[in-house]
UniProtKB/Swiss-Prot annotation:
Family named by the database record: Belongs to the heat shock protein 90 family.
GO cellular component, one term: cytoplasm
Gene that encodes it: htpG
Region (A): 1-326
Function: Molecular chaperone. Has ATPase activity.
Protein's recorded name: Chaperone protein HtpG
Compartments in which it is found: Cytoplasm
Residue numbers spanned by region B: 327-543
Keyword Cytoplasm: yes
Amino acid sequence: MAEEKRQFQAEVGKLLDIVVHSLYSNKEIFLRELISNASDSCDRLRYGAITEPDLLDGDSEFRIRLVPDKDAGTLTIIDNGQGMSHDELIANLGTIAKSGTSEFLARLTGDAKKDVSLIGQFGVGFYSAFMVAEEVTVTSRKAGEAKGWKWVSDGKGEFTVSPAEDAARGAAITLKLREGETEFLDAFRLKSIVKRYSDHIAIPVTLKDADKDEETINSASALWTRSKSEITPEQYKEFYHHVAHAFDEPWSTLHYKAEGAIEYTGLLFIPSSKPLDIFHPDRKQHVKLYVRRVFITDDCEELLPPYLRFVRGVVDSQDLPLNVSREMLQHNPVLSKIRTGLVKRILGELKKKSEDAEGKYDEFWAAFGPVLKEGIYEDFERKTDILELCRFRSTHGDGLTTLADYVARMKDGQDAIYTITGDDLDQLKKSPQLEGFAAKGVEVLLLTDPIDEFWVSAVRSYAEKDFRSVAAAGADLSKVKAPEGAEDKKADEAPADELTTLIEAVKLALGERVKDVRPSERLTESAVCLVAAEGEMSMHLEKMLRAHNQAPGERARILEINPRHALIKGLAARVKAGGTDAGLEDAAFLLLDQARIIEGEPPADPAAFARRMVSVMEKGLLG
């Protein structure tokens, strides 16, 4: 087969340009990335060989070799892992297969420290080789296949793939170093890099320097099997970088050994930065499962619930069989008990952190709060534990609050925890539905995450207090006393008979466009607002479902009018005096459209809305 010449995917070309010219301020990281990839390759073959031992072909001692050649100016990183086929070389090295590539490129800031973390999250550490190499050659043969392949590129837009004679199983990555990068041929320098970044790799990393004997230069023991007292914070951090493919600092580290009926070791990390794929629809978790130090899978859905998918790390079981299949894991009682133990530990760690006076928990909440809240809806058994970990914005100041603190601040006569949902915090604060609550000093939780709509309706109560939306018709503040000195609202209302006549006229004009028209107890400044009938889905939830084509159609809502507002009083007086002309009908539609706009909805008929606005302005300005 002749040599094939191919172009890099466009996004890869942009990435390579960033990597080579501006991204990494610490070039030695390339070696960590290549060793980490080699380790993953060996782990995957070790697992595959449990059921297909012939894949090993008599070579079962996994290792990673570093071979510097000062005369040729090359550094070669060799592993005897699973290797890559022809198509895998093209797919893995010529494209970024992970979703969200465009978002990744859009989020590059030019700040090396921030951008390097994005590189790691996308699993493209291989391209870091071009920081120090003017040409990269990958020679690889996949385990179980007879033919090997060679991939070559200078990182400038294209690469070639050709057959490779006598290729060994695994991969050999040869870097033709750039001028000025020869420090990476020095044995002492290579040893120090491996010691710093890759000492935790459980597979031996060896160095063959010229005519000297080959030597192992890492500890080659699984970090999680060591005692905590033997592990430094720096070693924990570097292991996190390896297992999470991340460059940020771990926000929290949890290392423990469970003993008893079920034995396992967990080394878990909570990142400090939000991964780009945290809201990907597959909600994949990222904790690697080992059985007696043999890698099994990094895609075990049963290991942790989706609402803890931000956790990174490893779990090593002593009780699962080595030949366990992914299908067997789905209903395995041992794994179920491990999952229960892990969730309890993680939630316990979060509880401890949330009680820390230093305020670092707010950093965690900003990154992962929306994900953790999924557990309120999905994990009914632990809903109270998770609710107590939650933090919320509210009308009580600018900071975050707990539900316990909210309940402690409830007013005399207040029998519910009041909420309002929406997309934007600033817009929620301006919602007319809040006016009556503010007037009586009643705090309202401001919920802006999509999951909020679901857990509030599912949980219903906390500390024997129901959750109630201020945008629903059932919100009743009649039992809550107004602050001393507050004006008597009833004294300033439109006369009851005039108001009744106006309401009937508005109902007649709007017809089925509204479910009802009512005088409002919640409005103090605005003329109108829309509310959902008791038991109906909120307007915000309906809007979300419509955006995903999951709502049957727009529902008619209740239009509340403020009997104390000058406009409403004026309209009421006009109707009582016999004014039922087209001007009143226009006013009714404008009131409804105003209420819709406040809710972030467009007028039902924009052209008619514009015509009515012009008509009203003409009468007001021109007489």
